[in-house]
Swiss-Prot record:
The keyword Signal does not apply. The gene is RRG9. This is Required for respiratory growth protein 9, mitochondrial. Belongs to the RRG9 family. Residues 184-214 are annotated as: Disordered.
Length: 214
């Protein structure tokens, strides 16, 4: 009996070593998911092509009524439908100063709608909604970097306008007096500032602020 036991010891050692190797590999696979699992995780958190191209209601696209639709999938489908299948990339983007002006006007005049602000800043109401919804605020270093970037952008645009011979837009300075706003001056680069000039943009601004106070 003992002779057969000792004779089988090498096989038992090999079997135990194999089990340890299997358990170690299983732990490694548990700690570091494979590329296939990572791709599967990303796919499960994204919308499929069939879901994006389907014209059926959102509630029937996932689970077919047998399970609840995840909230993230509802939001993605609704946004995809709202943008007509295109990515959010507006042609006109407001500068940081203009975005701050949008927030300031909305804070001071809560009754002012996104459509009113969109008409004045010549952007879509969706752009205004996203600006008001955003909570991110740049720190001091990021603000300096953005200012330098916009300064370089302004220099580049001036050079392009000078080369093409186009007339740059007029610069309008707005001053606040309590809860009222007024156009302080209208300047054209290369000319002296002119105060008290009634321009279409000035009239639109006063009309916009007057309508919000009603």
């Amino acid at each position: 009996m003992l002779g057969s036991y000792f004779a089988n010891l090498p096989h038992l050692y090999v079997h135990a070593a194999g089990l340890r190797a299997l358990s170690t590999s299983a732990q490694l696979r548990t700690k570091a998911p494979s590329a296939r699992k990572l791709i599967k995780m990303v796919t499960e958190s994204s919308l499929s092509k069939k879901e994006l191209e389907s014209g059926t209601p959102i509630e029937t696209q996932v689970g077919k009524g047998h399970e609840e639709v995840p909230e993230w999938k509802k939001q993605k489908l609704a946004l995809h439908k709202k943008l007509n299948g295109e990515h959010w990339n507006p042609k006109k983007k407001l500068s940081r100063d203009q975005q701050d002006a949008v927030r300031m006007l909305k804070q001071r005049y809560p009754d002012m709608t996104n459509s009113n602000l969109a008409d004045y800043f010549k952007v879509s109401a969706e752009s205004i909604r996203r600006i008001l919804k955003a909570k991110w605020q740049p720190n001091e270093d990021e603000m300096l970097e953005m200012q330098e970037r916009w300064k370089r952008r302004g220099t580049r645009i001036k050079e392009e306008l000078r080369e093409s011979g186009a007339i740059p837009e007029r610069r309008i300075r707005i001053a606040s007096d309590g809860n009222a706003f007024r156009v302080r001056s209208v300047e054209t680069p290369g000319e002296k500032s002119s105060k008290g000039i009634s321009t279409p943009l000035q009239k639109n601004l006063h009309r916009l602020l007057r309508n919000t106070r009603k």
